[in-house]
Curated annotation (Swiss-Prot):
This is Queuine tRNA-ribosyltransferase. Catalyzes the base-exchange of a guanine (G) residue with the queuine precursor 7-aminomethyl-7-deazaguanine (PreQ1) at position 34 (anticodon wobble position) in tRNAs with GU(N) anticodons (tRNA-Asp, -Asn, -His and -Tyr). Catalysis occurs through a double-displacement mechanism. The nucleophile active site attacks the C1' of nucleotide 34 to detach the guanine base from the RNA, forming a covalent enzyme-RNA intermediate. The proton acceptor active site deprotonates the incoming PreQ1, allowing a nucleophilic attack on the C1' of the ribose to form the product. Belongs to the queuine tRNA-ribosyltransferase family. Its cofactor is Zn(2+). One of its GO terms (biological process) is queuosine biosynthetic process. Pathway: tRNA modification; tRNA-queuosine biosynthesis. It catalyses: 7-aminomethyl-7-carbaguanine + guanosine(34) in tRNA = 7-aminomethyl-7-carbaguanosine(34) in tRNA + guanine. Zn(2+) binds at C304, C306, C309, H335. Residues 247-253, 271-275 are annotated as: RNA binding. Binds 1 zinc ion per subunit. Substrate binds at D91, S92, G93, G94, F95, D145, Q189, G216. Keywords: Glycosyltransferase, Metal-binding, Queuosine biosynthesis, Transferase, tRNA processing, Zinc. Homodimer. Within each dimer, one monomer is responsible for RNA recognition and catalysis, while the other monomer binds to the replacement base PreQ1. It comes from Vibrio atlanticus (strain LGP32) (Vibrio splendidus (strain Mel32)). The gene is tgt.
C-alpha cells in the first residue's frame, strides 16, 4: 500500500509527523539505519529494532549485484530475505553509480559501468532501477537520478539536474506501468545553485510523487551551502508530503535538518564510526581506542539506556577494540544506533511539547557549542 503521511504538528520550523505503512508506523522525524547488503553490519534485525529503528534503508545497486534479483524472488522480497518485519526504503542506485567515478559512462539512456564484483560490463537505467526495487518489495522506492558532483559549474549542474528530471519522469512512468502498489519518492537535484533547485522542485512536483528527497548534498560542499540549500528548498516542497535528506549525517546534522523542515534521514556514520571506535555521546565523540580509556570503569554515556551502556565499561570496550574482537564492533554499533534513535526521540518529544528551540539550545550546550544561526547568514 502507498504510505500515508500525517503532519501532526510544527514547532519553530520542525515538523512532527507519522508515516503509515502496511508493515507498520514510523514516527517522524526519523533516522533510518543503513543495511547496504541486506544487513545493518553486525546486527540482527531484532537488535536493530531494539535500538528504536522503525524503518531501514537497503541498497538497490549492491543487492542487484549480490545476491541478485532471482535470489531475492526465491525468498519473496528483501523483507523476507533479511527477516526485517518493518518498512524498507531503497535508494535507486544512482549514488553508487556516481561513486564509481571514471569506470562509468553516463548517457541519456542510463549508465554503463563495470561490475565492481567481477568486472562484467553492465547497464542500469530508470526502468531497470524500478524493476529491481519492485522485486525488493521496497515500501519506498527512489527514482533513478544522477547525483550532481561537487564542485560543479552552473552548466554542469544544470545539465545533470535536467537529465535527472527526465529520468524522474521515466521512473514515474515505469513504476506506474508495473502497477507497483508501494510509494515513489522524487529527488531534488541542482547542486549548490538555488535557481536550479527551483527548477527541479517545480518539475518534480508537476510529475507528482509520494514524497520528496533532497539529494546531491553531503558530497563535499561546505556545511553552510548545505544549510542554505535546505533553507531555500524545503519551504517549496509540498507540506503534506514527507521530506527526506539523503546520506546525512552527524547528530548535529540531523538537528540542523529538522530545524529546516526535514522528516527523514539515513547515514552509514553511526555504524561505520562504531567499527572504527568512534562513539557518539551526549558531550560529543569518544575515541574508545585512546589509552585514557584503559582504566575507565564508567559506561560510555551515563544518559544512555542501550545494552552496551547498561552492561559494559569504557575499559572493556577499549580492551575489545585493541584486541580487534568482533564483539567490540557489535557493542559499539548497538550504542551508536541507539544514540541516534535517542536524539530523534528527544527531537520528537520536544516538538510535541512545543520546546524544540530549547532542545536545540540544550543539545549544543552539552557539547560546549553555540547554536548555529538560521537564515542566509548561516
Amino acid at each position: 500500500m502507498k504510505l500515508k503521511y500525517e503532519l501532526k504538528k510544527t514547532n519553530s520550523g520542525a515538523r512532527r509527523g507519522q508515516l503509515q505503512f502496511e508493515r507498520g508506523t514510523v514516527e517522524t522525524p526519523a533516522f533510518m539505519p543503513v543495511g547496504t547488503y541486506g544487513t545493518v553490519k553486525g546486527m540482527t534485525p531484532e537488535e536493530v529494532k531494539d535500538t528504536g529503528a522503525e524503518i531501514l534503508l537497503g541498497n538497490t545497486f549492491h543487492l542487484w549485484l549480490r545476491p541478485g534479483q532471482e535470489i531475492m524472488k526465491l525468498h519473496g522480497d528483501l523483507h523476507d530475505f533479511m527477516n526485517w518485519k518493518g518498512p524498507i526504503l531503497t535508494d535507486s542506485g544512482g549514488f553508487q553509480v556516481f561513486s564509481l567515478g571514471a569506470t562509468r559512462k553516463i548517457t541519456e539512456e542510463g549508465v554503463h559501468f563495470r561490475n565492481p564484483v567481477n568486472g562484467d560490463k553492465i547497464f542500469m537505467d530508470a526502468e531497470k532501477s524500478m524493476e529491481i526495487q519492485k522485486d525488493l518489495g521496497s515500501d519506498i522506492v527512489m527514482i533513478f537520478d544522477e547525483c550532481t558532483p561537487y564542485p560543479a559549474t552552473h552548466k554542469e549542474a544544470k545539465d545533470s539536474m535536467e537529465m535527472s528530471l527526465r529520468w524522474a519522469q521515466r521512473s514515474r512512468d515505469h513504476f506506474d506501468k508495473q502497477e507497483n502498489p508501494n510509494s515513489l519518492f522524487g529527488i531534488v537535484q541542482g547542486g549548490v545553485y538555488e535557481d536550479l533547485r527551483d527548477v527541479s522542485v517545480k518539475g518534480l512536483t508537476e510529475i507528482g510523487f509520494d514524497g520528496y528527497a533532497v539529494g546531491g548534498l553531503a558530497v563535499g560542499e561546505p556545511k553552510e551551502d548545505m544549510h542554505r540549500i535546505l533553507e531555500h528548498t524545503c519551504p517549496q516542497l509540498p507540506e503534506d508530503k514527507p521530506r527526506y535528506l539523503m546520506g546525512v549525517g552527524k547528530p548535529e546534522d540531523l538537528v540542523e535538518g529538522v530545524r529546516r523542515g526535514i522528516d527523514m534521514f539515513d547515514c552509514v556514520m553511526p555504524t561505520r564510526n562504531a567499527r572504527n571506535g568512534h562513539l557518539f555521546v551526549t558531550e560529543g565523540v569518544i575515541k574508545i581506542r585512546n589509552a585514557k580509556h584503559k582504566t575507565d570503569t564508567t559506561p560510555l554515556d551515563s544518559d544512555c539506556d542501550c545494552y552496551t551502556c547498561k552492561n559494559y565499561s569504557k575499559s572493556y570496550l577499549h580492551h575489545l577494540d585493541r584486541c580487534n574482537e568482533i564483539l567490540g564492533a557489535r557493542l559499539n554499533t548497538i550504542h551508536n544506533l541507539r544514540f541516534y534513535q535517542r536524539v530523534m526521540s528527544d527531537i520528537r518529544q520536544s516538538i510535541d511539547e512545543d520546546r524544540f528551540e530549547e532542545f536545540v539550545a540544550e543539545f549544543y550546550a552539552r557539547m560546549g557549542r553555540e547554536v548555529p544561526p538560521l537564515g542566509k547568514e548561516s
